[in-house]
Amino acid sequence: MADTDATTEHPRDLSDAELDELFERCSNHGRWGDDDERGTLNLIDEEVRRRAAALVREGMAVPLGRPMPVAGSTIAPHPVVLQLLEPPGDRTAIDAVAITSHDSQMTHIDTLGHAFYKGRGYNGRPRSEVVGPTALNLFSVAAARDGFFCRGVLLDVAAARNVPYLAADEYVTTADLEAAERHGNVRVGPSDALVVHTGRAERLIAE
């Protein structure tokens, strides 16, 4: 059965003052120093990695990526561009791949340089200081160059609602996440990698 605390109602819009208060309450600006570029990746330390490794019971691999779209569609208007630089021969073939990573069909990792609030990014840095003419000056994916290994937690919002997938106009709320925790008998911790399942792939297939 669906969790009675989960909701399909559209969350109300926040006022500017409420959004400002929420931003300040959740902000990590200065938490790890003014020059930090890792953000909450700092929470993943050696002890976290040891605890995560101790949880492994099976050698199962769970892929989270999606196939790269090579044809345009409404959900992937900018498909991957493939170009063969050196024709296949007896020994090798070389290609070039151009990716627009922010299509909704493309698996990617957003960094701290991706979003800004009132013209400022992580640690209060102005956008003009973060974004260069061709690349990020700060907060790029290079901040995660050492990788991250931690416990992964799945919150299955669709299963908690007892539906195969959420409709396109439905939202995931705090109540949904808490209901999914109860449904999966898990609790999300500060150093966990969170995976939220809404059934989007299933919905796209069904539609």
Predicted feature locations:
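Active-/binding-site microenvironments in catalytic and ligand-binding cores
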Residues: M1-E207
